[in-house]
Amino acid sequence: MEDSMDMDNIAPLRPQNFLFGCELKADKKEYSFKVEDDENEHQLSLRTVSLGASAKDELHVVEAEGINYEGKTIKIALASLKPSVQPTVSLGGFEITPPVILRLKSGSGPVYVSGQHLVALEDLESSDDEDEEHEPSPKNAKRIAPDSASKVPRKKTRLEEEEEDSDEDDDDDEDDDDEDDDEEEEETPVKKTDSTKSKAAQKLNHNGKASALSTTQKTPKTPEQKGKQDTKPQTPKTPKTPLSSEEIKAKMQTYLEKGNVLPKVEVKFANYVKNCFRTENQKVIEDLWKWRQSLKDGK
């Protein structure tokens, strides 16, 4: 946790490139590249090593001295140049972490080394913007609190969950039938109100008086006619058949194979069967208890 918090608090780095160049010759064969800035990260990226126009036709060897991964001093040859054979070498971005010493090991020069000085500066402006974006509003914090507190874990046996799921499916079917009946009953008065509004919205005379509505009104329906319209056939609900003894045994066997345990006392076992499998048949319960005692798993 602490490492992740430290990584979040680190501001993003904004790289800056600066030109770098040095000259190595007979009277100055070494160039030391050191950085005293400890707050930012620095790197030296070497691009080319080339001979000057006045260089003699002899072998020029340029080496670099730095620190390896283990913190020990190491020397490597960067380029071997000769005016008549190879006057320049492209290093293609040879990056070295300072301190670095560039040295003309052989030859009189002049030799020119060019590249880039890379500095990674902290982008304070972007870090401030990110802090503002990550600050949660007080309204959101108040809304999150009750939601997290209202979550309470529940543990149930798998057999109880299966039985409850089957009961919920039956209840949902009954609720759907009731909702369909309610919607059909609600549609009837809506149609009546629409018809009365259309009757009242007849054209007015030029004098501003409404025409007689007696001829356009419908005759009221008798209670017998209303009863015929309201009474609609409903699909009969199929009663839920209780599970047989063999079906209950199969479910209990699956329950045991998953590492669970059945009650060992007859009274508790009977209550378990009644609650989980919704059966009141005493013969079925006695048959299941005999089967429970005959199990060889010892559970």
From Swiss-Prot:
Sequence repeats lie at residues 218-220, 221-223, 237-239, 240-242. It comes from the Eukaryota. GO terms for biological process: chromatin remodeling; DNA repair; positive regulation of transcription by RNA polymerase II; regulation of centrosome duplication; regulation of endodeoxyribonuclease activity; regulation of endoribonuclease activity; ribosomal large subunit biogenesis; ribosomal large subunit export from nucleus. Residues 218-242 are annotated as: 4 X 3 AA repeats of K-T-P. Keywords: Chaperone, Cytoplasm, Nucleus, Phosphoprotein, Repeat, RNA-binding. A motif (Nuclear localization signal) lies at residues 153-158, 189-195. InterPro entries: NPM1_C, Nucleoplasmin, Nucleoplasmin_core_dom, Nucleoplasmin_core_dom_sf. Signal peptide: none annotated. Residues 232-242 have a biased composition (Low complexity). It is found in: Cytoplasm; Nucleus, Nucleoplasm; Nucleus, Nucleolus. Residues 188-197, 221-231 have a biased composition (Basic and acidic residues). Residues 125-134, 160-187 have a biased composition (Acidic residues). The record marks 57, 82 as: Interaction between pentamers. One of its GO terms (cellular component) is ribonucleoprotein complex. Residues 125-247 are annotated as: Disordered. One of its GO terms (molecular function) is histone binding. Its main location: cytoplasm. Phosphorylated. Acts as a chaperonin for the core histones H3, H2B and H4. Associated with nucleolar ribonucleoprotein structures and bind single-stranded nucleic acids. It may function in the assembly and/or transport of ribosome. May stimulate endonuclease activity on apurinic/apyrimidinic (AP) double-stranded DNA. May inhibit endonuclease activity on AP single-stranded RNA. Decamer formed by two pentameric rings associated in a head-to-head fashion. Belongs to the nucleoplasmin family. This is Nucleophosmin. The lineage of its organism: Eukaryota, Metazoa, Chordata, Craniata, Vertebrata.
